[in-house]
Each structure stands twice: as structure tokens, then as C-alpha cells.
Amino acid sequence: MFGDCHIHMILDGVDYRAAFARHRTAPDEALIRRRLADYAARGVTFLRDGGDRWGVGLRAKALAGAYGIDYRSPAFNICRAGHYGAFLGRTFGDLAEYRALVAEVKALGGDFIKVMASGLMDFDHYGVLTDTPAEPELLRDLVAVAHDAGFAVMVHANGDAAVSASLAAGAESVEHGAYLHEETLHQLAESGAVWVPTLVTIGNLRHEGRFPDGVLEPLLAYQQQHVARAAALGAKLALGTDAGAYTVCHGEAVAQEYALLQEALGEKTDEILTAGETAIRRVFRPQA
């Protein structure tokens, strides 16, 4: 069984506000242990968290070894003030504030830096994103500061501009990656970064009633086609589900994501995903 290279232990796949409330006073250790036990029972031995500001991912990291799970956490995700991500992570207004957050990640024992470079896919409107991307110059600075502190960088990036800028900045992985163009797929392959496409965040919304299938079906098809093209160009891809996102349940989403990736990658699925996860494990290494 493959690991899950993108989860949010704090989220429950149903209601993020209720999920936050369970941990607002302190991480709900009993819930975390149940989820870790379920992952272990499914044969999942590697988890990479996307961070939260309540310390849930860090607590899961501390507990995971007892379940035979290698757990990596950025402590919290970091986003631009006034942009997507503040509901879950920490914000900065200038580079000095960002440097202070990176130092805090190190002090807390975080393993890498998670940066939010864009908004979400608008599941009501094909081709539309919910926020403007970070400027390329800013992303270069953010990645450089993280690298100087000894951290690899995981970037939430939707839209061709955000992904291309993240790759140019030297990010080690890009998450989601909606609406990429051919040139950026070549850039991805040449960069050596890992793409974690989280197809199940789209696939599990189909036929659910909240968003139109007339948007979801072509969006999923586009993403699968570009996953296949990226692999053909030699890009690295890894399995990650965004577990905890709406309709994406911890544990069971791993098999669901695998099935969607297999539709795109065919008989080379295991070879491609093994290489991608190996790269994630190597580059997003635990901090001493």
C-alpha cells in the first residue's frame, strides 16, 4: 500500500468548522489515535500532513511511531494575509513576518515548509480559481528563506501561473495543480519536483449534489489527461489525497486516489507512484 503524501489530520471530510472545534482547546488525542490505527490497519505507513494552526498534525507526528507510521508535518501552513488558507494556517504580511514563521516551524519541530500560493478550484465554474496567485518574485523569496533554514517546500498551487512560479522558485512539491499547460508540464519534468495531484478531491464530489457534474467530470478528465502527459514527460508524481477535505475521508481515500491515478497512468502506475513517494520521503526528511 502506498503512503498518503497529502493529508490534514485536523479535518474530517464532512464539516471543517466542527472538525476545528474538536481540537480548539487541545488536539483530540483519542481521535488522532483512531485515525492512525485505521491507517496502519490499511497498510499505510507514511503520511505527510499539510499543517494546521492548532497543533493537531504535530501531535499526530508524535504519536505515529507507535502505529508504525512515518509522519511528516510542517507544523502549520503559511499563507499571504488576506488570501486563501488563513482559516487553517498562519499568515504573513511581509518577508520579515514570514521569516519569523519559518523560525517558529523550526522551533516547533516541523519537518518542512508548506506555502499557499493560490486559491482553490471553483467547482461551480470550469477553469475558474477562487483567488489570485502569489507573485513569482514573492514565491522566489519564500522558497529561498525556507531553503536557507534547511527546509524543503510544499506548495499549494492551482492554476498554471502559480504552479509555474512555484517550480521556478525551486519548490520541491506542488499540490493539486489544476489547469496546467503543456509548457509547465515540461517545466515540472525538468525541475525534479513532485506533483501531488489529489484527484480524489474532484472525483469524490461527483454525483454528490453540491457541485455540478457538468463541471466536475470535464475537470477530472482534464486533470487525468495532464497527469498522464506529465508522466510521459518523465515528471515525478506521488499519491496524496488531501484527506479531510470535503468528501475525502481519512484512510479510504488512499484506494480511491489510487484508482483515479491508475485510470490515468495504466500499467506503470505502481512504478511511477513508488518513485514519487520515494522522492517525497527523501526530500521532505524529518528534522533532527
Where are the regions a protein language model picked out?
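Histidine/acidic-residue-rich catalytic or RNA/ligand-binding cores of hydrolases
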Residues: 13-17, 163-170, 201-213, 223, ...
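Metal-associated gating/positioning segment near the N- to mid-region
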Residues: 2-63, 84
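Alpha-helix-loop-beta-strand connector modules within alpha/beta enzyme cores
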Residues: 61-79, 129-155, 192-200
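Active-site mouth loops of central-metabolism enzymes
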Residues: 16-31, 82-100, 152-154, 216
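His/Asp/Glu-enriched, well-ordered alpha-helical/loop segment
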Residues: 148, 221-288
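Metal-dependent enolase-superfamily TIM-barrel catalytic cores that perform enediolate-based chemistry
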Residues: 91-161, 167-169
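Histidine-centered catalytic micro-motifs
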Residues: 2-12, 146, 153-158, 174
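Divalent metal-dependent hydrolysis catalytic cores, especially in the metallo-beta-lactamase
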Residues: 29-58, 68-78, 110-124, 152, ...
